[in-house]
Amino acid sequence: MSTMSARDNEKGSARSQPSHAAASEIENVPRPSRQQSWTGTMIKVFIICACAGIVSKYIIPLDSIFKSVHIDPHDYATRANRILSTTPLIDGHNDLPYLIRLETKNKIYDHEKLPFRTGLLSHTDQIKIQEGKLGGQFWSVFVECATDPNAEIDDPTWAVRDTLEQIDVTKRLVQEYPDLLEYCESASCAKAAFKRGKVGSFLGIEGGHQIGNSLASLRQVYDLGVRYITVTHNCDNAFATAASTVAVGKPDLGLTDFGREFVKEMNRLGMLVDLSHVSHQTMRDILSVTKAPVMFSHSSSYALSKHLRNVPDDVLNGVTKNGGVVMVTFVPSFLKVDDPASATIHDAVDHILHVAKVAGWDHVGIGSDFDGTADVPEGLENVSKYPRLIELLLERGVTDEQARKLIGENILRVWSNVEEIAENIRALGEKPNEETWSGRKWTAAIDIPMPFMFKDSADKRKEL
């Protein structure tokens, strides 16, 4: 509390005392009524609210202001930075969780053994993510196909267990770095995470073998947060033929009847159907039956590089009609099948431009396959190199609007459409699909005494 001297007090008192005449005049000034005070207050509130509305409309969306700032069109680095700062670059495929499985047995909390913040030798860590301005990532919760090439589709494996472990470690990794990563299960969350300065993190399964060729397992992994499944990896399954099968001279049988049920159930759930790794006939078959847009999480152009993992032009045209997206990958053997060692960032640019030319700029994206390939093209050594890729595209005449579609707007649109279609399907009352693969072997412990539900159950149990 402050103090005043007696002199100051007297001066203050003298200054504060009005003359009798002045006091009389003050007393005679009409005071505002309660209604007038209320009206004045409301006017002030209205003005404040109006100003707040103007601020929220014109000042808060800083990304809109940033987008409108004039930049020299030949300053490609600044243009690329603006694009990446205002639109999330969402990569369709990254295998970091599999490296964690292989090298740490999914132990992530010892930051000295897994220096994710300070730098890994592989393609992805916090420093590289921030330098590359990554805005969202589909993390692959991949586990491999059966190692025995003669294994039957329904032979028991550990694939489902291992997939659950990969879902677990990926979620825990995201939780361990909340200042950088944010777990998401929807397109709207991906957008919101980017606005909060976080890298939206989503789950994708790489092959139907990982769910045991089961629609019941499909529903369970959806409930666990998985938002896309690659129909096959490098092995056939109960759903379809893989590209790798055709590569060794076996017939391309395309999508099976059960595979059609699989796609139907994915549409009902709102799961993105991923066509990377499948055979060319499987691509065409799925496009003919799906009710929702599809994605290729990490594939390139077959016209430029005759690798069976790539997408032919007729399929690109089909993707246009379907409304889907082809996310171009950086795997050297896919970019230049005849000379992978010479592949560079410029080859990736060529593939992006070809997909855009054939399918349209609304149907192309980026799916690097970082940490899923030992070799990478010169200039695309790791996640930090995205800005340079965008610069080169701008140098080749790509507009800012086209670049925004490429890096994130297209996959977000496709994802949102898949979610909306699923809501409409479920609103019509379609129930979960109960079909099972025709070659499924059911087992029963018939030696354990159990009651029967039906008269003929004894014979049926013996048939299991």
Curated annotation (Swiss-Prot):
Q: How does the record classify its membrane topology?
A: Single-pass membrane protein
Q: Which reaction does it catalyse?
A: an L-aminoacyl-L-amino acid + H2O = 2 an L-alpha-amino acid
Q: Which domain of life is it from?
A: Eukaryota
Q: Where does substrate bind?
A: 233, 309, 369
User: Molecular function (GO) terms listed?
Assistant: metal ion binding; metallodipeptidase activity
Enumerate the Pfam families for this protein.
Peptidase_M19 (PF01244)
**Family, per the entry?**
Belongs to the metallo-dependent hydrolases superfamily. Peptidase M19 family.
* Protein name stated in the entry: Putative dipeptidase CPC735_014430
Is Membrane there in the keyword field?
Answer: yes
Instruction: Show the disulfide pairing.
Output: 145-235
Write the signal peptide boundaries. Answer: none
Q: Which UniProt keywords apply?
A: Dipeptidase, Disulfide bond, Glycoprotein, Hydrolase, Membrane, Metal-binding, Metalloprotease, Protease, Transmembrane, Transmembrane helix, Zinc
